[in-house]
Amino acid sequence: MAAAVVLLRRLRGVTAAPRRAAAALPLTTSVRGVSDSTEPLTIETSVPYKSHIVDPPPREVATTARELATFFRDMSAMRRAEIAADSLYKAKLIRGFCHLYDGQEAVAVGMEAATTRADAIITAYRDHCAYLARGGDLAALFAELMGRRGGCSRGKGGSMHLYKKDANFYGGHGIVGAQVPLGCGLAFAQRYRKEAAVTFDLYGDGAANQGQLFEALNMAALWKLPVVLVCENNHYGMGTAEWRASKSPAYYKRGDYVPGLKVDGMDVLAVKQACKFAKQHALENGPIILEMDTYRYHGHSMSDPGSTYRTRDEIAGIRQERDPIERVRKLLLAHDFATTQELKDMEKEIRKQVDTAIAKAKESPMPDPSELFTNVYVNDCGLESFGVDRKVVRTVLP
């Protein structure tokens, strides 16, 4: 994060300790005048938390000018990256599935601010910004989206299967809800190894009715696994509104015997506070559910215009009233931590960096055709298989 600190010039002359690396994108934006102060201040969340069989955390969230400026930068970078991905897809440089996250940036950024790299994160197929929040490289992201060798999954994963093992980011998963049991498995490993870490296990409201979620939740509660199940409720499972798919859309109560919180997922400070609270709960008591009330601006995927099952007025209303980036912009301006022009300059620098990352990604070669056969089997594993006739077949895989 030392690179992130360089981004912002001190306004008040306060000597600041470096912010931990876990909460920042690897950007090098430098904007004069934006406050880098670490003087603490308290801001109240936009709305109260709703809770299920647990006392909610306080609405007052401790933050600093530096943190707010970093939030603004990181969310703006994510937004610009997703808009760029939209253009690359329409130019046919990105093929196949592509699910964009713009509008939901506060969830990824707020969650990262409450965790360390020892904590694990696993999510579904809308995973670009979760990867970036874990410190993922912009050029590696775009290279992966374009199927290039320099991608974070060597060009073989594409949009839905980003991965960053050194940051404990276990990727996106294309099957709805399939990642939830895997996340509980990560938490099982953390408990088995006696690690002081938790797993944030993300899924959408469209996956909230999947059977494997309840099976995994039961086992997690039974064994008191250190897992935080995060339902990113953007209110539409593909094109189906939540009220058409769920008898009870209060997803934070779905755990029955598992505590839950409903959080304004468009308020990055509320997300940070809730995730910090949930992490401590998971370490001490086992699983907890966080329902993030959020919203995606794009359609479900690139083939979905996003306007056949909801009105354009609805989308515009959310942008105007709840946009996560604009909320932080208003806080920075209201507390005189930055001027309008300084924030615009930061956004211009971000756009340049995204463009530079795309140009670098385009220079990366396509994977060699032989890559089709790598990482499929383990070499020399001495597989033993049994047929119905009980005869043993031994073989060595290529």
UniProtKB/Swiss-Prot annotation:
Pyruvate binds at residues 99, 125-126, 174, 176, 205-207, 234, 236. GO terms for molecular function: metal ion binding; pyruvate dehydrogenase (acetyl-transferring) activity. CDD domains: TPP_E1_PDC_ADC_BCADC. Mg(2+) binds at residues 205, 234, 236. Its cofactor is thiamine diphosphate; Mg(2+). It catalyses: N(6)-[(R)-lipoyl]-L-lysyl-[protein] + pyruvate + H(+) = N(6)-[(R)-S(8)-acetyldihydrolipoyl]-L-lysyl-[protein] + CO2. The keyword Nucleotide-binding does not apply. Keywords: Magnesium, Metal-binding, Mitochondrion, Oxidoreductase, Phosphoprotein, Pyruvate, Thiamine pyrophosphate, Transit peptide. One of its GO terms (biological process) is pyruvate decarboxylation to acetyl-CoA. It is an enzyme of class 1 (oxidoreductase). It holds the Pfam family E1_dh. Residues 1-33 form a transit peptide. It is found in: Mitochondrion matrix. The pyruvate dehydrogenase complex catalyzes the overall conversion of pyruvate to acetyl-CoA and CO(2). It contains multiple copies of three enzymatic components: pyruvate dehydrogenase (E1), dihydrolipoamide acetyltransferase (E2) and lipoamide dehydrogenase (E3). Tetramer of 2 alpha and 2 beta subunits. PANTHER family: PYRUVATE DEHYDROGENASE E1 COMPONENT SUBUNIT ALPHA-2, MITOCHONDRIAL, PYRUVATE DEHYDROGENASE E1 COMPONENT, ALPHA SUBUNIT BACTERIAL AND ORGANELLAR. This is Pyruvate dehydrogenase E1 component subunit alpha-2, mitochondrial.
